[in-house]
Amino acid sequence: MARQKLTFKEQMDGFPWVQLVVVSLVRFSEPIAFSSLFPYVYFMVRDFNIAPNDAQVSKYSGYLSSSFALCQVISAYHWGRFSEKHGRKITLTCGLIGTSVSLLILGFSRNFYQALVARSLMGLLNGNVGVIRTIIGEIATERKHQALAFSTMPLLFQFGAVVGPMIGGFLVFRDGTMNEVPLWFPHFAKRIIRSYPYALPNVVVCMFLMFGLTNATLFLEETHPAFKDRRDYGLEVGDFIKKNIFGIQPKRRPWQKRIQDDSENIHHRNENVNSIRGQDSEEDENSPLVNTTNDDDTESIQSIDPILTRRQSVGLIRTYSLHEPTDAVHANIDTAPDGCKESSIFHHVFHTKVFYPISVNFIMALHLIVYNEFLPVFLAYDLAVDPENPKKLASKFPWKISGGIGYEPEQTGTLLSTTGIFGCFVVIFIFPIVDRNFDCLTIFRTLVKLYPIMYVMVPYVVFLQNERIPSWYTVVYLYIITGIKTFCGALTSPQIMLLIHNSSPLSCRSVINGATISISASARFIGPLVWGYIMSWSQQNDVAWVSWWSLSLFCMVALYQSYKIAPIDDNENELHGQGSEDAYNSQSQSSDLRMAHRSSLSSLSNQRCTT
């Protein structure tokens, strides 16, 4: 089906800005927490005196990063299951609290093992990335809004990746450095900072997290179809604040409507009870009843005060209940051709159309984490020169490449932070234009082709380190490489999330998102381990291009897999989503009515007792 081109005004019509802003405040705080560690982790591990020498510090720093990713593999799927059973909002708040606790433990750690526990807890106690993806999909229900809504994820990560390193870099006050504690700090704060030099950045990041937690508690609406009508005391407090402080009239909540409707119907229900009681007085109360009640109805009847007769109780339940027998449903459990239950997550992930988007996402996560981790390492290697002629490079074009270009951390940090700002520009200004004119599969397939080219280019920056070549050539060359990566990442990340979202059944969408996060985390755990070995081997054998070219080949697998992803039919997707939503709403309404009539029965019994 041809993609209908929309104007910006048409695409923004009805866009759920308010709820998306609340979710964005939560999402923005999390990459700050994740990236604030990078500037000082080397010095923190070194100060723990766990490494036998400075050369081994990076290995122990890698353990901290790997423990986080490994624990995400373990926990993300279970957080998705938790959100399906208890709702998205409670899962989000638990994740924010868990991250805050783990950051405080990290900041006040006295040894390496405490820091390792803190990083592990950060991975275990937070599955918010997958839950936030689900929330965004349930907030942006119209196809024209989804791509722009999902694009907020990489945008906020880019912003957080700029702010986080600034906090971690400027708020660490270590002895023997130029970064000293400001004179205006209170005396007790100075004592704490001197004892725990890495605590302050973590405390500041916790403030960001608490701000996001407060906003989520007060203003975020539950998006799970089965729980969105459940009473939310946090929202009620938020509505009170909006009305009495900001003068904004909040909308009526579903549970407020239900309570009012119940109170209006009490009078009619009293009349029905009296009518049933009058009819029943003419019959023998010991006579057998027609055996048409199911177990749930029987349980409801038995829970009613004996002041109401059994026949009166049956009349009320039949009048107000939408409950239907479900024995047939439980007896008929479909089994897929793969031998798994059709409702199982294994079936949905590995034997349905969502498999290909998830597999592509795994490859993307792996090669991007390898790039992010090892590009600074490669640039930091000393420039290898010919022992016989120091003015010449030891590398020989095109196959013999050794060493790096001797970049300092400040140079690498400037390079990465600048391209991060460029990524924000891409998401804000370029992404909406691209999304309005092309479908997500076309965008994704086109941009994925650029990754292999970029990785092939990386090792050849060594040959620009020549006296006859101006130094700005190297800067431009590196900005081209990092710019391509940032441009492609900013535009492909929301597309693959959208493809996974729209390929997932609504009934287990949050669980699939949780499984996706676990699979991506496993990629971030495996990638650095494997390519760390490859990079070490290639440097020792003067073939540094092998590590980057192998990464390029791995990207081509993602390109191949992308052609197996089924295109999204916008009309079919919207109809399917609406139908599934209606099914959830129908179940929720049925449950609400059953609870309402049971509450009414209890009230009627109490009224009869008092009379």
Swiss-Prot record:
Keywords from UniProt, A to Z, are: Chloride, Chloride channel, Ion channel, Ion transport, Membrane, Phosphoprotein, Transmembrane, Transmembrane helix, Transport
Q: Which family does it belong to?
A: Belongs to the major facilitator superfamily.
Lipid bilayer topology: Multi-pass membrane protein
Q: Does the keyword Thylakoid apply?
A: no
Region of interest called Disordered, as start-end residue ranges on this chain: 261-301
Q: Which residues lie on this side of the membrane: Cytoplasmic?
A: 111-152, 221-353, 435-442, 564-611
Chain ranges sitting on the Extracellular side read: 1-89, 174-199, 373-413, 464-542
The protein in question is named Major facilitator superfamily domain-containing protein YCR023C
| Residue spans crossing the bilayer | 90-110, 153-173, 200-220, 354-372, 414-434, 443-463, 543-563
PTM Phosphoserine: at which residues?
313, 603
CDD domains attached to this UniProt entry: MFS_SLC46_TetA_like (cd17330)
Q: Which SUPFAM superfamilies match?
A: MFS general substrate transporter
The organism's place on the tree of life at top rank? Eukaryota
Which Pfam families does this UniProt record tie to the protein? MFS_1
Where do Basic and acidic residues bias regions lie?
261-271
PANTHER family named in the record: MAJOR FACILITATOR SUPERFAMILY (MFS) PROFILE DOMAIN-CONTAINING PROTEIN, MAJOR FACILITATOR SUPERFAMILY DOMAIN-CONTAINING PROTEIN 10
Q: Supply the InterPro entries for this chain.
A: MFS (IPR011701), MFS_dom (IPR020846), MFS_trans_sf (IPR036259)
- Spell out the subcellular localization from the entry: Membrane
